[in-house]
Amino acid sequence: MAKKMNAFYAQSGGVTAVINASACGVIETARKHKDKIGKVYAGRNGIIGALTEDLIDTSKESAAAIAALRSTPSGAFGSCRFKLKSLEANKREYERLIEVFKAHNIGYFFYNGGGDSADTCFKVSQLSEAMGYPIQAIHVPKTVDNDLPITDCCPGFGSVAKYIAVSTLEASYDVRSMAKTSTKVFVIEVMGRHAGWIAAAGGLVEDHGIPVVILFPEIEFDQKK
């Protein structure tokens, strides 16, 4: 019989309204498969928690506490903006991760984040196998930008899309009420980097006679138009 292994879960990058719901899903599902997965450790402040061996034993939390994560905003275990360098630039960081995983009998690595987190999962999987301690590295998608490949609607995007749609609607009402003597243009800058999904959400507002101009990063801006 294969040895039962523990799991490690970490949150990465900017938190969203639903990242804790993903954490809840990982922990609750692991608890349903106690024959295969032992404890679920969470990294305090993301992947840094693994590098510093600062782990939270979620098995000490009640079922009610874990279930409450579904409706808890922000990042319950702490997140970080810490990008692991490439294997060539700093192999030691990856080796340190695997050392900690080995010390705590961790065979499953759940990394909740964006594209960089997916890349980290791939590298950890490759190196751990080369080191003779193969780890199942699973990327749990999370990004408000909605820019992950082969992902139609990423967890986190729906919440921010609603927020931007409501904010655009409220701003347009402000402009309409003040346009006679004051503000005639209201500029809203949103996140998204090279993807225009969040910007596009501003177009979800109802047609109330106020023009909404949306500029997408995918389309070159022509000032003459």
Feature roles, as predicted:
Residues 12-14, 43-48, 81-82, 114-115, ...:
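Short, ordered loop/turn segments at secondary-structure junctions
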Residues 100, 111-113, 121-123, 127-134, ...:
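Accessory alpha-helical/coil subdomains and C-terminal extensions
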Residues 6-16, 76-81, 107-113, 185-190:
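Short glycine-rich or small-residue beta-strand-to-loop segments that form or flank ligand, phosphate
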Residues 53-107, 116-117, 144, 155-156, ...:
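Glycine-rich oxoanion-binding loops at beta->alpha junctions
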Residues 2-54:
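N-terminal phosphate-binding or glycine-rich loops at protein starts, especially the Walker A/P-loop
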Residues 27-34, 44, 48-51, 70-73, ...:
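Structural signal for hydrophobic packing residues in well-ordered secondary-structure cores
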Residues 16-26, 50-51, 92-95, 115-123, ...:
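Short glycine/serine/threonine-rich phosphate/pyrophosphate-binding segments
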Residues 2-7, 35-38, 71-74, 104-108, ...:
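Short coil/turn connectors at secondary-structure junctions
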